[in-house]
Amino acid sequence: MSSAEALAFDVIVIGGGHAGCEAASAAARAGARTALVTHRFDTIGVMSCNPAIGGLGKGHLVREIDALDGLMGRVADRAGIQFRLLNRRKGPAVRGPRTQADRKLYRLAMQQMITEQENLTVVEGGAADLVCDGERISGVTLADGRVLKCGAVVLTTGTFLNGLIHIGEKRFPAGRMGEKPALGLSERLLSFGFTLGRLKTGTPPRLDGRTIDWQSLDMQSADEEPVPFSLMTDRITTPQIECGITRTTPETHDIIRANLHRSAMYSGSIEGIGPRYCPSVEDKIVKFGDRDGHQIFLEPEGLDDDTVYPNGISTSLPEDVQLEILKTIPGLEKAVLLQPGYAIEYDFIDPRELKRSLETRKVCGLFLAGQINGTTGYEEAGAQGLLAGLNAARRAAGSEPVILQRTEAYIGVMVDDLTSRGVSEPYRMFTSRAEFRLSLRADNADQRLTPLADEVGILSEERRKRYLTRETALSHARMVTQSLSITPNLAGYYDLRLNQDGVRRSAYDLLSYPDINLDRLIAIWPELASIDPVTREALEIEAQYAVYMERQQSDIAVMEREERLLIPSGLDFDAISGLSNELKQKLKQRKPETIAEAQRVDGMTPAAVALLIAQIRKFGGRQKLAAETLEGKGAA
């Protein structure tokens, strides 16, 4: 191979964080010759902030990443040291799988998977510039002068884009503690005409677990039967740990109030907006000052690591104030601070600059994923990375992009929210953001998305076999339970209370009743005992939601019709009589591709949508007439 060939790729991914790893893996699985550009190999897969994966809404994203044969679920299963299923007592649609992770195990597992991936080369170095041929991306220039040629680039800069760390009055450029920021790329993005903004996130101090008084604290255990994230994981083998729970005190709050003027957040030093749902401890005291305390989870960062992450006291106060605060918190009175908490500001691009493929509208072949799009969280980043990497590979190959709809996946909900509404603060996923969350459950992510992964060529043979085995078992169990039926009278003999309407009900129908599970039906039909535990749970959940799913299908059909109604690229919004000048301007700026996208433009009314649909039909009629006229002239 010549040196020129060695520096030529189909796809280049910049950044080795959660978005970058998923992007690089997806592009390589799609058949693209891929380069992952990162400063150092040993920082690939580093968990910059909290040592945890999943949670409410976020756990759904991890399951969807896994269903598309991504990495995060498998890596989390290898590194997880405290698995807990959140909202266990609520319905399956809103349950959130979560695990604390051993930072070292997570990083090493991710690095191993990146190393083993075919078609993927890790290139150590800093990305200094993007190379374009006209309005199309053509390569990346590294800080050492090397130029890598490519057909598409995925930019996953995280908090490194003009990153600035704040600790009280101190501030210094960094991508995260101890690592340099990316300083040149923002200028290049501005030169392309992108709209950049500033966002902020923060992290708590790190503590020496050997100096914490664990005996005085309440402890929280892992689930007795850990539920893995990945279809590929048979069982969790990593030892499980406990976490400590403590609270801030009125004395803590007094110290924070007395030093607010020294906090970077409240002194005016930070212009970026922080995440609403992960507030700093200063924010908690200012906004919820009437509370006598705020909960703190003390999360060990590893099985052989004494570092503890105090989840709940993210701060940008000076280090001396952080030490004072620790002395007022039960169990932490003598805790040694290993690293101060800090806030970090960074550049992001208005995600309305993106198509739903995560390709930028202004530069062909340039894709963005992760915090550069205004999101917060490993899971949100990983999900975007997978979609961007897949579509970058398809762009390089000249194929049509993959678009996930709101009706198909939480990934589709997130991307649609970002590209249609933009962000005013860091975006995080919640189940409440999805209109169709009864069908977008964590437990059925494989059924929803694995066939798509197979169709677009990113599914391994091993996963295909495992998926088909599980689906075959579920299909057989469904068929068996639908073939068995019972009358209300006979059901009463087995203490099943049904309406005495004379209607026979199948075992599958009975599973939709809240007080009936498979264990109760085995007394009637002993053959059901042969259904394995995994299939049993899937069948019970499916049957439980079957009635609701039938009702929801009509709503899904309406949205899918709107998604299919395309807005022609040549449509003149200014020519639509009755549309306000404000809406005309917003539509020209946003350039929605479907009626569904147009409906989510701020200020769009039902009347405006009707006008737009009428104009599309009129435009389509003119196009058809023009085509017929051309055909007639050709025939003459």
Swiss-Prot record:
Major location category of this protein: cytoplasm
Record PROSITE patterns: GIDA_1 (PS01280), GIDA_2 (PS01281)
Gene3D superfamilies with a match to the protein in the record: FAD/NAD(P)-binding domain, GidA associated domain, C-terminal subdomain, tRNA uridine 5-carboxymethylaminomethyl modification enzyme MnmG/GidA
NAD found in the keyword field: yes
Keywords: Cytoplasm, FAD, Flavoprotein, NAD, tRNA processing
Domain of life the protein comes from: Bacteria
Keyword Repeat: no
Gene Ontology MF: a single term: flavin adenine dinucleotide binding
NCBIfam families reported in the protein's UniProt record: mnmG_gidA (TIGR00136)
Function: NAD-binding protein involved in the addition of a carboxymethylaminomethyl (cmnm) group at the wobble position (U34) of certain tRNAs, forming tRNA-cmnm(5)s(2)U34.
Subunit note: Homodimer. Heterotetramer of two MnmE and two MnmG subunits.
UniProt similarity note: Belongs to the MnmG family.
Protein name, as recorded: tRNA uridine 5-carboxymethylaminomethyl modification enzyme MnmG
Species, as recorded: Brucella abortus (strain 2308)
Gene designation: mnmG
